[in-house]
């Protein structure tokens, strides 16, 4: 009688869990690719851990808090570590909707990956899209970073204003001295008219240009 019951349960499970069955998901693991020489063998203990992680994930879904490890069925396990699994509802003898299983796996994807030391690329749920890892909190608060950036901008702007003011002040100081130098140069310039060197008229000191003084004026004192 017990053997008959065992075969009956096995037949039911085989009908529920099969490749491409309704609400079934295929899983593919690349343990050696991920861990290299530290790769572990996939055995019954690892299968039990996988079932436990799926049951743990399903318990977080509303109205699925009673999910047990025995409700998770695995089938078509290959040596290259790929298999199919379903989550059953023993009370109704059918599999849970794929949408619920998918939601549970996505919410706990990181926990499942960490349990096997894998990631989304080496532990693939082929019909369940990968999820992004939750954002990590920065060690420095964001407001401090923003304040630091603004402070640096204000500091640079202040330095530029100071440098610009110093340059303008220097230009103003150089202006009058350059004008005086140019006037002095103009006063000392000797022009040549008709081959005769002529001194410019000294307007400040009343200097008379000798080129325009007649011989009588030179000999006759004033």
Curated annotation (Swiss-Prot):
The chain crosses the membrane at residues 142-162. It comes from the Eukaryota. The modification Phosphothreonine is found at residues 214, 220. Residues 15-141 are extracellular. Residues 1-14 form the signal peptide. The keyword Transmembrane applies. Keywords: Cell membrane, Glycoprotein, Membrane, Phosphoprotein, Signal, Transmembrane, Transmembrane helix. It is a single-pass type I membrane protein. GO terms for biological process: positive regulation of amino acid transport. Glycans are attached at residues 76, 93. One of its GO terms (cellular component) is plasma membrane. The keyword Cell membrane applies. Glycosylated. Glycosylation is required for plasma membrane localization and for its cleavage by BACE2. Its main location: membrane. InterPro entries: Collectrin, Collectrin_dom. The record marks 125-126 as: Cleavage by BACE2. It is found in: Cell membrane. Residues 21-222 form the Collectrin-like domain. Residues 163-222 are cytoplasmic. The cleavage site containing the double Phe-Phe motif acts as negative regulator of shedding by BACE2. Plays an important role in amino acid transport by acting as binding partner of amino acid transporters SLC6A18 and SLC6A19, regulating their trafficking on the cell surface and their activity. May also play a role in trafficking of amino acid transporters SLC3A1 and SLC7A9 to the renal cortical cell membrane. Regulator of SNARE complex function. Stimulator of beta cell replication. Monomer. Homodimer; dimerization prevents CLTRN cleavage by BACE2. Interacts with SLC6A18; this interaction regulates the trafficking of SLC6A18 to the cell membrane and its amino acid transporter activity. Interacts with SLC6A19; this interaction regulates the trafficking of SLC6A19 to the cell membrane and its amino acid transporter activity. Interacts with SNAPIN. Belongs to the CLTRN family. This is Collectrin.
